[in-house]
């Protein structure tokens, strides 16, 4: 089925989604399964760059959501003490052996959870972490311990997502755009990027930086303020903006913001560059 036919079938099914269930067969189920296979293999992405802008393929998000109506809950083996989990989305690695892992070309350390419908590019390293369906992780990227990469989030190549960081998902609300981390970015430990924020290529977010759609991102050098995007090659730390005076004239509480303290330079690259030894 061509992409155009897939999109048409899924869009039509979405309009009639109330009537779709685990009993549904035929073209709708086949289209959703094919869409998930395209996402899983990396042949399609929920978001892709067209020139300087990112384009979101909403129909692929709809396919992911429709799969929850089509697929029933089943036991998933591999729980602690020979127990099982109970879910609708199988592991990406279900049925895999040495042949499949070698062909995929990435490392999956014990304790990482990757749901089917997500794509992991060759050379990536997955420490114990969680990667949700629809997500895309680029070539050579390190996903460190306790990282969460949410549904449909897009992470570029040669990135380092540090321990405990969160890259938020975007299955609801439906029209929301996914979080995008462009190539060669460093996301510090326990940082969080959410609500469709785009982190531009080569940027560095310090430990504990939180950025959502309404977070003020202030360039300390120019005074310029950004919302929803970090310009390429920015070094970002947490900060505060002065609060407005309270009614009695006393200083009001300051508000959180993210501060661009400089642009990436050789010193920054030396501290945050990827270690090729870990990717072999």
Swiss-Prot record:
Enzyme class: transferase
Matching Gene3D superfamilies: Hexapeptide repeat proteins (2.160.10.10), Tetrahydrodipicolinate-N-succinyltransferase, N-terminal domain (1.10.166.10)
Keyword NAD: no
Chief place of localization: cytoplasm
The protein's Enzyme Commission number: 2.3.1.117
Highest taxon, organism lineage: Bacteria
GO terms assigned for molecular function: 2,3,4,5-tetrahydropyridine-2,6-dicarboxylate N-succinyltransferase activity; nucleotidyltransferase activity
This protein's pathway: Amino-acid biosynthesis; L-lysine biosynthesis via DAP pathway; LL-2,6-diaminopimelate from (S)-tetrahydrodipicolinate (succinylase route): step 1/3
Alphabetic keyword roster: Acyltransferase, Amino-acid biosynthesis, Cytoplasm, Diaminopimelate biosynthesis, Lysine biosynthesis, Repeat, Transferase
GO terms for cellular component: cytoplasm
Catalysed reactions, semicolon-separated: (S)-2,3,4,5-tetrahydrodipicolinate + succinyl-CoA + H2O = (S)-2-succinylamino-6-oxoheptanedioate + CoA
BP-aspect Gene Ontology terms: diaminopimelate biosynthetic process; lysine biosynthetic process via diaminopimelate
HAMAP family found in the cross-reference section: DapD
Family annotation (NCBIfam families): dapD, PRK11830.1
Protein name: 2,3,4,5-tetrahydropyridine-2,6-dicarboxylate N-succinyltransferase
Organism field: Methylorubrum populi (strain ATCC BAA-705 / NCIMB 13946 / BJ001)
Organism ancestry: Bacteria, Pseudomonadati, Pseudomonadota, Alphaproteobacteria, Hyphomicrobiales
